[in-house]
């Protein structure tokens, strides 16, 4: 040990040993491993490491982690700056920029983007950023920015409250909708006239001419008005986790207290199929069906309570509301411009499915523990079956029938 102390005084022998250990490892090495192999005080080891980093001979891709070779940025790691303060802020900025560009990612993808090899190397900084409210992680281990990178850093420093989510305009056939908050990842494909959240209001009046035989009419997509963002304090309704896979969504509401007033196109939409087989009834026991919904009534909930969890797989949703106390009114307008009512036969023709595979219209309530699903859901309301709250989907000739059903409930 006396000889080792002499070598540390010069530093030459320690530098060679550090370079040899990093070269033999072939991947980033934690500071604890270096201390164990070199048997030197941590303070002296850090001094030599930062001197080598300044010379471009080693780099620090993560906090308390070192590798052989420079990082392409000379002079940014002065020895007098503590290790964590020098490496961690720079790495946080790189992670925030990566997620801001690429969207939600798994830890392994983030690690590879930073030049690392395993998720374990980046997990400590990810969870540290989550504790600072810079990042959030979903139940599927997808990491995303809590807000934007700049706003997230300002929030971590000043403790400013979370802003309401931005209004989302649907511009592509497949859209990624991310609510910037903890445990709120929503992924939806093939959406049209859709509302996500609580207390939304959508009203669209479409006057359809004669679009020609066999040509469906596609009106301009509406702008979503998030009334909950204005009237409801942040965090009142809690988190949402929604997965709708392989779903054709038309006029869909997700959340509580939404209201939608639309006019149905006179030309029937073509039947959409995700496979060559026709629609058929399925149950939650089938491997290709997934449904799980937990929707307490709107309002403050205990800490950790989840407001809405929806898993729907391989389902076509048309004129559908998911949540509590939603209201949807759909008017049918003929080619001549006059309104006409919709009946069960027209509803049946919309779906192209048998009466056995088509759920009843109007006051249909599916509880959260429902075991029956159809691969095509039309004019259907999904909720928690609460007797105090009614999910309604009304057509002009069904208002009276809906009121009767509500009384019976």
UniProtKB/Swiss-Prot annotation:
Could you describe the post-translational modifications of this protein? Ubiquitinated; polyubiquitinated following influenza A virus (IAV) infection.
The residue ranges flagged as biased composition, category Basic and acidic residues, are 337-351
- GO BP, sorted A to Z: activation of innate immune response; antiviral innate immune response; apoptotic process; defense response to fungus; defense response to virus; positive regulation of apoptotic process; positive regulation of inflammatory response; positive regulation of necroptotic process
What does the record say about activity regulation?
Answer: ZBP1-dependent necroptosis is normally inhibited by RIPK1: RIPK1 inhibits the ZBP1-induced activation of RIPK3 via FADD-mediated recruitment of CASP8, which cleaves RIPK1 and limits TNF-induced necroptosis.
| GO cellular component: a single term | nucleus
Ranges spanned by the short sequence motif RIP homotypic interaction motif (RHIM) 1, renumbered to the chain: 183-207
Which positions does the motif RIP homotypic interaction motif (RHIM) 2 occupy?
Answer: 241-265
Subunit description:
Homodimer. Interacts (via RIP homotypic interaction motif) with RIPK3; leading to RIPK3 activation and necroptosis; interaction is enhanced by CASP6. Interacts (via RIP homotypic interaction motif) with RIPK1. Component of the AIM2 PANoptosome complex, a multiprotein complex that drives inflammatory cell death (PANoptosis).
Q: What does this gene product do?
A: Key innate sensor that recognizes and binds Z-RNA structures, which are produced by a number of viruses, such as herpesvirus, orthomyxovirus or flavivirus, and triggers different forms of cell death. ZBP1 acts as an essential mediator of pyroptosis, necroptosis and apoptosis (PANoptosis), an integral part of host defense against pathogens, by activating RIPK3, caspase-8 (CASP8), and the NLRP3 inflammasome.
Q: What protein does this entry describe?
A: Z-DNA-binding protein 1
Q: Which organism is it from?
A: Rattus norvegicus (Rat)
List the lineage, top down.
Eukaryota, Metazoa, Chordata, Craniata, Vertebrata
